[in-house]
Amino acid sequence: MENVKYDKKYFEQRRAELKNIFDQIKPDLQDLADYFAPNAVRFIARNINKPHVKSKKILDSTTFIAVRNFASGMMTGATSPTRRWFKTGIMNRDNKKNKMSYAAKLWCSNQAELSRKILYASNFYQLLPEVYEQLGVFLFSCMTMEKDYDNVANFKVLPIGSYYYSKDGRGVVDTVCRNYMESAKNLVERYGLENCSDAVQQVYKARPNDMFEIVHFVEPNREYKEGSPISAQKKFISVTYEVGNGTTSFLKKAGFDKFPYVVFEASCNGEDAYPSKGCGIYALPDAKQLMSMIKELGKAVKKMVSPAYQGSASLKNKRLSDNPGFFNEDGDSGAGIRPIHEVNPQVLDLKNIIAELRENIKSIFYNDLFAMILNTAERGRTATEVNELKEEKLVLLSPLLEQIHTALKQILDWLFNTEMEAGILPEVPQELEGEEIEIEFISTLAQAMKAQNISSMERFITFTANMAQAVDPVLIKKIKGEKMIDDYADFANIDPNQIAPNEELEALRQQQAEKQAQAEQMQQLQAGSE
């Protein structure tokens, strides 16, 4: 393993490298912010507690509405706090998932319920809309994951531009450099007075709310030793330090077994560090054209309502008015007063173009898809019916949803590890010891994409029953009833607590067989006595 001196100079060099890469996309991010989210970027850490940015380029609320609806749709469709949107299983090796005992399935259900309760008690759901807004506009968003004494877990969403990241050879984010501001009071309380710079110590008592720029850097540890309890030998190295202030030491140097950041991303182009394919980029040309058309419409209406006038030179110094009943003396010319331009702007055509651009922007942010799902849900339709109505639209959403699921899996994996360290997991059945946990998503959107499996099963059962009735009754035995019911329950997201285990069914069959045997024996005895 290559020896590396993990000092402040090393991490400042790494920060500069990551910043150079990020600076290449910075103009694009600013362009997106100007039209969709003016207050979402913070390229300079010290730009905090500033007045809200008012973009002069936004002349219509369509972009705001499209982004808001996208975030709301993702919350409702993918991660609604009011429904079970994920469940826990065991990694599907050699079809092992389908061979789990009832006790194992019940443990998985209880573990997933524990994770849901922790997420609900934390600030996770309050922050997710902001994550989805950033993801929709800028194509990526970053969230921190921290252990919390009161709620087990705590999360933060970072402003766009306040951090840089890089990936490993598999395309997985494994390095994050975050720049942020912290008050002297918070620095002393968190890291101790003796670990802070002289500048912090000098203002701590007199001006505790003075802000200082801080860097938090996490990357793979080149001194990593698997299973080591020593912080310096954990899988990821973590350092926190002040920018400048003449210090060479760290506020804190630690290590993590699990990466403490999760990055939500849209699609990347090859080996690019940052994504370049997503809603914001696709909708930007329409947004620019929309604002231009809004401006032209305003000019046209203004010329019609309040045009510039022309008249005789003799009227120059006379008082004129367009008030009702007022008499304007025309002089000798008889030409009167009339608009300079006798034009009829094509206002209707402009309005049609504007309406089309608005719909394009909303469609790019999947507003029509989410509206369809919510409207059909209100009429009591199931995810299966939604899928039958607009299956092609769900297919369009599928790539982005898979990217979101990848990030959510990382959060749930980190949360499982935190539960295990805190000792609050349910007692693990012996058959699951050493097995790898698998997360399956069962949200409205995920279920809609899986609904075709349920339809296929129902058609197969109907077909087999008809064949058995028409051709040979023995054909009904082709259906493995218990397996079909278990699979149906899995696809339909039925709680295992609501399903009797196969062991109980086997016991019932045994009881029925014994009763039938006893009845037959009694009949034989009665027949013999006669």
What is the predicted function of each stretch?
Residues 1-202:
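Extended, helix-rich architectural segments
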Residues 138, 285, 352, 356:
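Short, well-structured alpha-helical interface segments that form or flank functional binding sites
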Residues 1-24, 28, 306-530:
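C-terminal anchoring/interaction modules
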